[in-house]
Amino acid sequence: MDKKASRIRRATRARRKIAELGATRLVVHRTPRHVYAQVIAANGSEVIAAASTVEKAIREQVKYTGNIEAAKAVGKAVAERALEKGVSTVAFDRSGFQYHGRVAALADSAREAGLKF
């Protein structure tokens, strides 16, 4: 089993548990160059809020899009957008990525901006 298959297996298991809870989830995806975050409704069919380093507004705030500072900017932006839509509590879905570095920075930034998880 390669690295990507292992990550997807971990992500599937976590998503199954979150679905059983029926919770709105904050999903994180990372690539070497970008970080993406979405708040997805409990039924899984609607994206309530989203932010990523691909967006021009966030790219202008940061020097490089693939580092911890960029992840913090994405976390703050997605939390603010979710709170505007009335979502304050979410389950954190790290998509099988290790809770470390950019993933942890995004989560901490979203918490500081007012999102509860």
From Swiss-Prot:
This is one of the proteins that bind and probably mediate the attachment of the 5S RNA into the large ribosomal subunit, where it forms part of the central protuberance. This is Large ribosomal subunit protein uL18. GO terms for molecular function: 5S rRNA binding; structural constituent of ribosome. One of its GO terms (cellular component) is cytosolic large ribosomal subunit. Pfam families: Ribosomal_L18p (PF00861). The gene is rplR. Belongs to the universal ribosomal protein uL18 family. PANTHER family: 39S RIBOSOMAL PROTEIN L18, MITOCHONDRIAL, LARGE RIBOSOMAL SUBUNIT PROTEIN UL18M. Keywords: Ribonucleoprotein, Ribosomal protein, RNA-binding, rRNA-binding. One of its GO terms (biological process) is translation. Part of the 50S ribosomal subunit; part of the 5S rRNA/L5/L18/L25 subcomplex. Contacts the 5S and 23S rRNAs. It comes from the Bacteria. It comes from Vibrio vulnificus (strain YJ016).
